[in-house]
Amino acid sequence: MTMLETKTDPMVISMGPHHPSMHGVLRLIVTLDGENVIDCEPVLGYLHRGMEKIAENRTIVQYLPYVTRWDYLATMFTEAITVNAPERLANIEVPKRASYIRVIMLELSRIASHLLWLGPFMADIGAQTPFFYIFREREMIYDLFEAATGMRMMHNYFRIGGVAADLPYGWVDKCLDFCDYFLPKVDEYERLITNNPIFLKRVKDIGKISKEDAINWGLSGPMLRASGVKWDLRKVDNYECYDELDWSIQWQSDGDCLARYQVRIGEMRESIKIIQQALKAIPGGPYENLEARRLSKGRKSEWNNFEYQFIGKKPSPTFKMPKQEHYVRVEAPKGELGVFLIGDDNVFPWRWKIRAPGFINVQILPQLVQGMKLADIMTILGSIDIIMGEVDR
């Protein structure tokens, strides 16, 4: 029974868009009764840049540098989906070597993304030490990216029919050394974090999502797998060469913040397993499909004359997309990243719809925080792992 003297009116406060724990420019309008959350309304759109409309006024080759600005912490995945869509639409074959290189880059990007989720998530809860540890390992991944692509973050490495450049001399050995170094570090994170009583108090049984809710809300990625659903597009769709490698889906059944943390820690270990196998089994051959890079009139040209030598090495600016539609998806670190592409027998896509995992996953936030304490909002929002670049697009 509530005593009338102590009963207070609900208080409406605005968290963000500049609050450090909002992970970007997210704004939450929170209704509080004391310290208990009655209601929460996310306000999106502060980082909207019209990415879908830009795509409809650019060729795919011109659009490639833009896509790394969606999820700017896992840029390889946005590039992968951008080249996979026209490849599937036009039935362009990717050489085996290029496929293996892509898988290695994607998994390195997954580890980098999970590391940069883990550090700020722990800092939100109040643990500062892991925040500095994860930057040490993440820097090594960025060094590998810089050696292979020339860029630390916005790589612009994937191309229609392959990748931009082959792996440089000595890169494979360097990457294997990193894998051997990184696995014990994951154990170190676990020793430091998992059984810490303060950490467990903050995350156990907080923000629980049932299996049915996870499916009904359309959640994907670690959010879905932490609720007891063994669903990973790398196993389901078998894109690139994932079906040739031996690895297992990481999942938990509790559906709380702790389960989501455990899934991501497990995924980092599995990613290392995938990278090690791919590096050892990487075949020789071309790293791109040159046929995909010739101009449409170039198909009629001789293979060795001046015209081919001049234009055959450049990405084709007049690659026309057939008049059909296609939905392509990849398993990004945050969930299912998809693109619905409609071609119109033109160099520009007629429609380019982005299915951003963060946008779908953040919709369940109001349901999760109702009845919780104000401090739990940081924990729950952090465990969802959103990047506003892809939420607002």
From Swiss-Prot:
Keywords from the UniProt entry: Chloroplast, Membrane, NAD, NADP, Plastid, Plastoquinone, Quinone, Thylakoid, Translocase, Transport
PROSITE patterns linked to this entry: COMPLEX1_49K
InterPro entries named among the record's database cross-references: NADH_Q_OxRdtase_suD, NADH_UbQ_OxRdtase_49kDa_CS, NDH1_su_D/H, NiFe-Hase_large
One Gene Ontology term from the biological process aspect of the record: photosynthesis, light reaction
Annotated GO CC locations: chloroplast thylakoid membrane
Coiled-coil ranges per UniProt: none
Stated name of the protein: NAD(P)H-quinone oxidoreductase subunit H, chloroplastic
Source species of the chain: Chlorokybus atmophyticus (Soil alga)
